[in-house]
Regions:
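Phosphate-binding glycine-rich loop
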Residues: 1-12
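Short hydrophobic alpha-helical segments of the AMP-binding
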Residues: 6, 23-27
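A short helix->loop->beta-strand "cap" motif at the edges of active sites that frequently abuts
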Residues: 11, 32, 96-99, 127-128
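Short beta-strand->loop structural element characteristic of the AMP-binding/adenylate-forming
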Residues: 33-42
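Active-site phosphate-binding strand-loop segment of PLP-dependent enzymes
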Residues: 41-116
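Conserved core segment of the aminotransferase class I/II
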Residues: 124-189
Length: 189
């Protein structure tokens, strides 16, 4: 699903450093150059807002087209949860630069620091600019049964992006087998 989203969005992809191991290879497979942006000291999964803006400026100066910011507020590699204020600054910068934010929320329901931050996703702040992606195998169905879900914005670029991603998935016959579809429907109910 992430591959279809990246192919549908086109342009350059900005990733955090560190990020999930499969992000950069999928961007390359989609034909999108991937650029890494360092994370702030207090968390992973989201880029430092100032480093993001500097990276976007540099990519554009070199003739690139930064179109997608892929982040994970509940970060797998670092095991951290991005504070809402940093996440807001990052999303505000990405929206100002006309980028689509893909928020990988596979681990949003995992237990984080008790008494610490409550998960606040980018789509709750900027619903018209964020595609929410989750892999149900992360927490809801057996890992051998691949099933992912994406929630697209209802307005703006959302409908066109959804249509292009759906076309890409249909072209490769990315269909859920009936038992997986039933498990996914149950998990999402």
């Amino acid at each position: 699903l992430l591959l279809a989203l990246l192919a549908a969005a086109g342009g350059d992809v900005l990733l955090t450093r560190p990020c999930a191991a499969w992000y950069a290879p999928l961007a390359r497979l989609a034909g999108s150059p991937a650029f890494h942006v360092p994370v702030p000291a207090e968390c992973g999964g989201v880029p430092d807002p100032f480093a993001l803006l500097e990276t976007v400026r540099r990519i554009r100066a070199e003739g690139g087209r930064p179109r997608v910011l892929l982040l994970s507020a509940a970060d797998d590699p670092t095991g951290t949860l991005a504070p809402p204020e940093i996440l807001h600054e990052v999303c505000e910068a990405a929206v100002a630069e006309r980028m689509t934010v893909i928020s990988d929320e596979t681990w949003r329901d995992a237990r984080h620091h008790p008494g610490g931050s409550v998960f606040l996703g980018p789509a709750e702040m900027w619903p018209e600019h964020v595609v929410v992606l989750t892999d149900l195998a992360g927490a809801l169905i057996p890992t051998a049964w691949p099933a992912a879900v994406a929630r697209f914005p209802a307005a703006g670029r959302g409908p066109a992006l959804r249509a292009r991603a759906t076309e890409a998935l249909a072209a490769v016959r990315a269909e859920l087998p009936p038992p997986v579809a039933a498990a996914a429907a149950y998990a999402l109910a």
